[in-house]
Amino acid sequence: MKKNPKISLIGSGNIGGTLAHLISLRNLGDIVLFDVAEGVPQGKALDLMQAGTIAGSDIKIKGTNDYKDIEGSDAIIITAGLPRKPGISRDDLISINTGIMKNVAENVKKYAPDAFVIVITNPLDVMVYVMLKESGLPHNKVIGMAGVLDSSRFNLFLAEEFKVSVSNVNSTVLGGHGDAMVPLARYSTISGVPIPDLIKMGLSSNKNIEKIIDRTRNGGGEIVALLKTGSAYYAPAASAIEMLEAYLKDKRQILTCAAYLQGEYGVNDLYVGVPIIIGKEGVIKVVELQLTKEEKALFDKSVEGVKKLLDTIK
């Protein structure tokens, strides 16, 4: 009998709990739910296992406060850290969450050095860099959840604008996972037709698309302002699951993620959101899009923002 993959979730808050539920429903593997708060991962694990009996899932879920339980993990998703709250930007979280990420990285290095690691903790582009450098894992096995989520928001707003199914929309968002991200209308389509062509057909306007791009950039902040006590968790969890599944099932799927760049897009030694192919080796290839001068300028501005943020912790 084939052994289930072992998936460890570091952080058992809203995203961690949602991740565990989705993994169980999709039967992706057995789960270790870790948190420093005593009782929280254990309680959620028991609740989720009981929910699994209704769904007919035999996935095993263990709640723990001991890092040793992540030993031998095939994949790890990290959500540990302070979430955003109203008035707090992703960047304000940097000093506290850097300390948390360093501790997580040490334990990943110790107990699961062969794992594929997905980081969700904000500020994302810096946290995933810290994970890489502190853990010593190969860069193709450490990525950040960014573009899949940003594209999902762009997809929704475009579907609403054109009054079509979200399944007809395919969008691309590059750059840092922050307010300077770069939603690319030229590389976004409705049933294969690029957005600029649809504008020429009179189905929308440049003004409307610019509003949608601005809303996409502030997508996380919009939810933080509405919730008042936290940040988004359903969509971030669903985005990470898509990345996890591409790895576990060797799908060789193109997804936009925060990936480590070594010259691609003219960027070195930095994590930035770009399209990558994900399969059983982790990051198989970085896909380099041909950008116009204007698009490249926006991308470079976003990259500069990531660099400045990273400089504050170096």
From Swiss-Prot:
UniProt keyword NAD, yes or no:
yes
What residues sit in the active site?
H177
Q: Write the record's keywords in alphabetical order, separated by commas.
A: NAD, Oxidoreductase, Tricarboxylic acid cycle
Kindly give the Gene3D superfamilies that the UniProt entry links to this protein: Lactate dehydrogenase/glycoside hydrolase, family 4, C-terminal, NAD(P)-binding Rossmann-like Domain
Q: Which reaction does it catalyse?
A: (S)-malate + NAD(+) = oxaloacetate + NADH + H(+)
Superkingdom, taxonomy of origin: Bacteria
Write out the residues that bind substrate: R84, R90, N122, R153
MF annotations from Gene Ontology: L-lactate dehydrogenase activity; L-malate dehydrogenase (NAD+) activity
Q: Which residues bind NAD(+)?
A: G11, S12, G13, N14, I15, G16, D35, N97, I120, T121, N122
Q: What is its EC number?
A: 1.1.1.37
Q: Which GO terms describe its biological process?
A: lactate metabolic process; tricarboxylic acid cycle
Q: Where is the signal peptide?
A: none
Task: Check the record and name the SUPFAM superfamilies matching this protein.
Answer: LDH C-terminal domain-like (SSF56327), NAD(P)-binding Rossmann-fold domains (SSF51735)
Q: Which family does it belong to?
A: Belongs to the LDH/MDH superfamily. MDH type 3 family.
Q: What does this protein do?
A: Catalyzes the reversible oxidation of malate to oxaloacetate.
User: NCBIfam families in the record, alphabetically?
Assistant: MalateDH_bact, PRK06223.1
* Record-linked PANTHER family: L-2-HYDROXYCARBOXYLATE DEHYDROGENASE (NAD(P)(+)), L-LACTATE DEHYDROGENASE
Q: What is this protein called?
A: Malate dehydrogenase
Phylogenetic classification of the source organism: Bacteria, Pseudomonadati, Pseudomonadota, Alphaproteobacteria, Rickettsiales
- Gene name tied to this protein: mdh
